[in-house]
Structures are given as structure tokens and as C-alpha cells.
């Protein structure tokens, strides 16, 4: 009978599953988040509680034997939406603990191939959003950006943008997972955001957005227009939140204006409903956030 490990979806939880597999000498067929668990026929379910001490031991052991790059790769892969990521991480850790430093480079090895493919996909998704994410200033002085990524990369984006805009308050909202990264004063947190409303765009923002869209339209050379090539380099799933790709002129409150409440930013710039801190999101924990996430 096959076994499925079920955990809470955090990186600490995933590392706890790795520890459990070693401690119990089991080889679980699946390691899945509780929110998406669907057991196979006749499969035994084993709920693995998150244990930070166990997670820390796995982290420290992986860094000691395999190098920090291997641990950082685990953090990146855990941001994937692939349901097989848990099993891929376990197989990689087992191989890496035997192989030692450089194991994460053995991308052709059967124990590393799936892991490496997921890591590459997450890094590529992050890279695309670094290019195509667009911020909009709303009343209250906060900059808002929306995204619909194919991996849980908001925490990775927060590391990058917070390091560069450490004096600017901003929010990056994931429309797919209903979570938001909130940065203020150079530090940031991840919160659950089932409701996300923002104040209207500032007058300056509307002027700049209109100018940017006009520049984008005017700088193109009609005779060299190639819509297929553009869609290849800039997939259409990014377009709806890109200022230059909006068909109509920016209207006041291009983000849904709602009954704004004070949120610490001033002037009710952003409301995220009953926001709840995500203390163990894939890369949000101070201890478990890979440095390379930025």
C-alpha cells in the first residue's frame, strides 16, 4: 500500500516531511499540501505536522553536506505549483545527501531531472514578472501591482523589489492565490488577501500612465508590426495588468475602489479584507527564505 504525506503547504512543513521520511524509513509515493490532497485508490494518508526544529535540522544538514545552493534550490522548487514537487524534493534531498556538493547541477540524473525542471520553471516565471509587473500609485502614496503567476513567486518578487525600493511602500497582489506581499520601510510580509480593494489612482499616476501608453503606441513601427512575435516574447496572460496594453485610457480608480479602511499606509490606500499573516509561506519565513530568491 502506498503512502501519501500531507502537510500544511509551508516550506517548514515540507522539510518536516523529509525528516519524517528519514526517521520512519518510509518512501512516500506522494507529498502533497493538505489544500490539494486527493488520495489515490487504496492509498494510506499520513498527516505530518510542521516541526521547525526538524525543519532546521534538514536545512542545516543539507547546507553542510551539499552547500547552500542545494538548499536554495529546494526553496525555489517549493514555490512551484506542480503537484509532484514534494516527491521531487524528497528524491533530490536523498540523492544530494549521498552525492554531496554539486548535486543540484546533475540535471540529467533521474533523481534530479524533475527537480531541476521545476526549479528552472519557477525561476523563469519570476524573471518574466520582474519584466512585466506594472505598479500604479494610488491615493495615499502606495504603489500597487497585480499579477497572475503560474507559480507562487510573489515572495520572490518581494525580495527583489523591496531591496531596490526600500523607501517606498508597495503591495504586490496575486490574483490567483489571493495573497499579497506588503512592503513598508524596506521590510515586508506576506498576507492572505481574500478581499483586495485599493483607492483610486492619483492624478499624477493617470497622467504618467497615459503618457507611457502613448509613447508605447507611437514608438512602434507599423510596417514591422508582428503580433505573433510580440505574444511569444510577452505572453497574453500578462497583458491585462500592463499599463501599455490596456485598450482604453486609464480611468479613475483602475483598481477597484472600495470602502477603504485605515491600514497603516495612510488615507485608506489599500484594504485587504480580513488579512492574515502568512508566517510560513513558501519563501516568507526569515529563516527559510533562500537568499537567491532575490
Where are these regions (language model features)?
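Acidic, Ser/Thr-rich peripheral helices and adjacent loops at domain boundaries
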Residues: 46-54, 187-201
Amino acid at each position: 500500500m502506498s503512502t501519501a504525506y500531507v502537510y500544511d503547504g509551508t516550506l517548514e512543513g515540507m522539510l518536516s516531511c523529509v525528516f519524517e521520511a528519514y526517521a520512519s524509513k518510509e518512501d512516500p509515493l506522494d507529498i502533497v499540501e493538505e489544500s490539494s490532497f486527493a488520495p489515490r485508490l487504496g492509498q494510506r494518508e499520513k498527516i505530518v505536522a510542521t516541526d521547525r526544529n526538524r525543519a532546521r535540522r534538514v536545512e542545516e544538514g543539507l547546507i553542510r553536506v551539499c552547500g547552500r545552493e542545494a538548499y536554495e534550490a529546494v526553496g525555489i522548487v517549493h514555490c512551484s505549483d506542480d503537484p509532484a514537487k514534494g516527491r521531487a524534493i524528497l528524491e533530490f534531498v536523498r540523492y544530494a545527501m549521498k552525492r554531496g556538493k554539486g548535486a543540484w547541477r546533475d540535471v540529467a540524473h533521474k533523481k534530479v531531472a524533475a527537480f531541476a525542471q521545476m526549479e528552472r520553471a519557477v525561476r523563469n516565471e519570476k524573471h518574466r514578472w520582474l519584466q512585466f509587473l506594472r505598479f500604479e500609485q494610488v491615493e495615499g502614496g502606495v504603489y500597487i501591482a497585480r499579477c497572475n503567476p503560474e507559480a507562487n513567486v510573489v515572495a520572490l518578487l518581494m525580495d527583489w523589489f523591496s531591496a531596490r525600493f526600500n523607501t517606498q511602500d508597495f503591495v504586490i497582489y496575486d490574483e490567483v492565490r489571493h495573497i499579497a506581499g506588503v512592503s513598508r520601510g524596506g521590510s515586508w510580509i506576506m498576507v492572505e488577501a481574500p478581499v483586495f480593494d485599493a483607492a483610486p489612482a492619483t492624478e499624477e499616476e493617470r497622467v504618467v500612465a497615459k503618457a507611457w501608453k502613448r509613447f508605447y503606441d507611437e514608438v512602434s513601427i507599423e510596417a514591422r508590426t508582428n503580433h505573433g512575435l510580440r505574444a511569444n516574447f510577452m505572453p497574453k496572460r500578462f497583458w491585462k495588468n500592463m499599463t501599455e496594453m490596456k485598450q482604453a485610457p486609464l480611468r479613475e480608480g483602475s483598481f477597484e475602489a472600495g470602502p477603504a479602511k485605515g491600514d497603516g499606509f495612510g488615507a485608506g490606500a489599500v484594504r485587504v479584507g480580513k488579512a492574515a499573516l502568512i508566517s510560513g509561506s513558501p519563501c516568507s519565513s526569515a529563516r527559510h527564505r533562500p537568499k537567491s530568491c532575490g
